[in-house]
């Protein structure tokens, strides 16, 4: 098989539905070559084979496998019966909420809300979302590894008086609870990433998520305790990686390039310090050599090629349509929004819900997409601070920019690069949507020209660069879900 594929189950996801406006179709720049399969298939008693994704933090799925569980006790069954008797509209709503997107999506929503509230810059937001979803992915993979090793029957099978609520997978072991493992991993990572948020508040969400497994009659308390412990242990691996990924480096303030043709603070804010100048040296997840992927330099300032690029920006901004302005504002992902990476995760979320993906599939889609964008940010910022390219407004201060130009070098476009990476990954997983996803990426990169922030070459090279990065992420993964 040449692509990583998911069944679409019906109509394709309209980009107008997802983005509220469309753009003319475009073609993919490449087809994925065959990718060697490294899937592990788990077959629980009475169940069907499960294609298990790769781990990103653990060396193997069984690295942190918990010890075998004891037999469930009568006391555990009685506890579930008592909780069942107390079910209400409130508990039923909580059960439904924490089961959305197979138990993964609520934590994506929590993270995106934190990105908005704390006003994380796009690069930091992309890094945070990758750490979170890598941890969730590994927690799910490890939980399913343990389920395969230790089969434990559902409480409702052991005690028919228990009426399980929510999704039921016959033949799947309840030990450990994958939902609790997700909660343990996600809460541990989010506490590290967002110290502004109180530990108690995030831990309360983890407890709420885990408790719904009991309220629904889906798991024994020992399943939940084991899942939380497993998830928290994996979350600590993500924290350790985050502490060593180079993101705590401080810039010494020295400029490689200065003078005409190089980035300088731009009107109207004239922010003196460029954003995240060290991000190009952060550790990547799937790209083995950032410098080897670095694009060639842009046209030199003042040359005919550069003048043609600047004229293209003048023309685009002068002829900007209301729809193009709307697109530029949508894709901007400015401070106080979910960020550009968050926009692509919202697209992924809608596709996950449309196709009703299971827990393993959902965790995998979000991890691959987030990791591709995090690596794309690093590679893009490596190019930005290698070339220190001037922004278009430095060549023509009369440009009609839509809002203030971002405070960092122009070449290449971060929006174009991460959009190319995200669309390549999602298009590889959802091949029937690849054309629509590519069109979204093209619109995202064009939006930066329409806003007056980037030359066409910034966007075109960035998009191609991102597609290459997305392909590398897919090549690290398996061929089927």
Regions found by a protein language model. Give the residues of each.
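Acidic/polar surface patches and capping/hinge elements
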Residues: 40-481
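Short, intrinsically disordered low-complexity segments
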Residues: 8-15, 19, 37, 204, ...
């Amino acid at each position: 098989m040449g692509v990583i594929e998911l069944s679409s189950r019906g109509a394709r996801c309209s980009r107008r539905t997802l983005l509220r406006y469309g753009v003319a179709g475009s073609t993919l720049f490449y087809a994925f070559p065959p990718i060697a399969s490294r899937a592990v298939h788990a077959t629980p008693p009475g169940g069907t084979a499960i294609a298990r994704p790769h781990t990103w933090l653990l060396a193997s799925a069984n690295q942190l496998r918990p010890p075998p569980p004891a037999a469930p006790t009568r006391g555990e069954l009685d506890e579930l019966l008592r909780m069942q008797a107390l079910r209400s509209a409130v508990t039923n709503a909580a059960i439904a909420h924490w089961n959305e997107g197979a138990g993964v999506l609520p934590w994506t929503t929590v993270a995106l809300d934190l990105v908005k509230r704390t006003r994380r810059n796009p690069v930091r937001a992309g890094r945070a979302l990758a750490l979170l979803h890598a941890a969730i992915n590994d927690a799910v993979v490890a939980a399913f590894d343990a389920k395969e090793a230790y089969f434990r029957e559902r409480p409702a099978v052991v005690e028919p008086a228990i009426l399980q609520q929510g999704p039921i997978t016959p033949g799947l072991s309840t030990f450990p609870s994958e939902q609790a493992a997700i909660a343990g991993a996600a809460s541990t990572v989010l506490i590290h990433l967002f110290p502004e948020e109180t530990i108690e508040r995030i831990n309360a969400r983890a407890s709420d998520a885990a408790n719904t497994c009991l309220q629904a009659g889906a798991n024994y308390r020992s399943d939940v305790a084991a899942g939380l412990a497993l998830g928290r242990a994996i979350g600590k691996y993500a924290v350790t990686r985050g502490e060593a990924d180079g993101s705590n480096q401080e810039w010494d303030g020295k400029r490689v390039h200065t003078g005409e043709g190089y980035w300088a603070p731009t009107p109207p804010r004239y922010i003196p310090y460029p954003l995240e100048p060290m991000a190009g040296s952060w550790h990547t997840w799937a790209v083995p050599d950032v410098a080897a992927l670095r694009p060639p330099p842009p046209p030199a300032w003042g040359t005919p090629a550069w003048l043609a690029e600047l004229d293209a920006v003048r023309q685009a901004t002068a002829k900007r349509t209301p729809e193009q302005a709307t697109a530029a504002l949508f894709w901007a992902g400015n401070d106080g929004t979910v960020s550009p990476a968050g926009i692509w995760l919202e697209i992924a979320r809608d596709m996950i819900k449309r196709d009703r993906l299971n827990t393993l599939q959902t965790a995998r889609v979000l991890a691959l997409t987030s990791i591709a964008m995090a690596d794309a940010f690093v590679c893009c910022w490596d190019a930005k601070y290698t070339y220190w390219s001037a922004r278009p407004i430095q060549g023509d201060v009369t440009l009609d920019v839509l809002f203030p130009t971002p405070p960092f070098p122009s070449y290449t476009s971060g929006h174009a690069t991460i959009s190319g990476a995200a669309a390549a990954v999602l298009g590889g997983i959802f091949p029937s949507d690849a054309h629509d996803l590519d069109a979204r990426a093209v619109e995202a990169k064009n939006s930066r020209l329409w806003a007056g922030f980037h030359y066409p070459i910034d966007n075109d090279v960035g998009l191609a660069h991102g597609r290459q990065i997305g392909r590398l992420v897919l090549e690290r993964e398996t061929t089927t879900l």
